[in-house]
Amino acid sequence: MYQRKIERELRCPLEYGLDIFGGKWNSRIICILFIKGSLRYNELKAEMLDITDTVLSRTLKELMQNNMVERRQYNEIPMRVTYQLIEKAESVIPIFETICQWSKKYLAPDDINNSICGQFLKQDGEFFILAEE
C-alpha cells in the first residue's frame, strides 16, 4: 500500500473528509455498499465495472484503515469474506446525497450517468434507490 513520505498536514476538517471519502473509488465503494449491503469481493468488483483488482484491494484496505468498511471472514470452506459499511461510513451518506442533488442541478442532462451512486435520495428520513428512467 502506498505510504506518504511526508506526513500530510490537515489544516481544516474539510481536508480530513475529502482525504477519507474523496477520490475516484472511495465514494463509489461507500455508495455501493450502502445500497447493496454486505458484499463479497467479486460481487463488489462486478458493481464497480471498470476497477482493477489491485486498485479495489488497495482502496478496501484504505477504507478499513480509516474505519469506514469492515471485512468479515467466515469460518467456512471455501472461505467466505464480505465487506460492509460501518457507522462512520454510513454517516457520510447524507453528504453524498447532497452532492448528488447539487451535481444533478449543475451537470448537463446528457452527462448524468445512472450509476448506482447517483440513485439514492432521502424521503422521510430514509434513503431509497431511484427507479431507472
Residue map of PLM features:
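Beta-hairpin "wing" of winged helix-turn-helix
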Residues: 64-84
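C-terminal regulatory/oligomerization modules of transcriptional regulators
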Residues: 1-9, 65, 70, 87-88, ...
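Basic amphipathic alpha-helical segments that dock to polyanions
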Residues: 56, 60-63
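Non-catalytic interaction surface on structured domains
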Residues: 16-20, 45-47, 71, 107-114
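N-terminal helix-turn-helix DNA-binding core of bacterial DNA-binding proteins
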Residues: 8, 12-55, 82
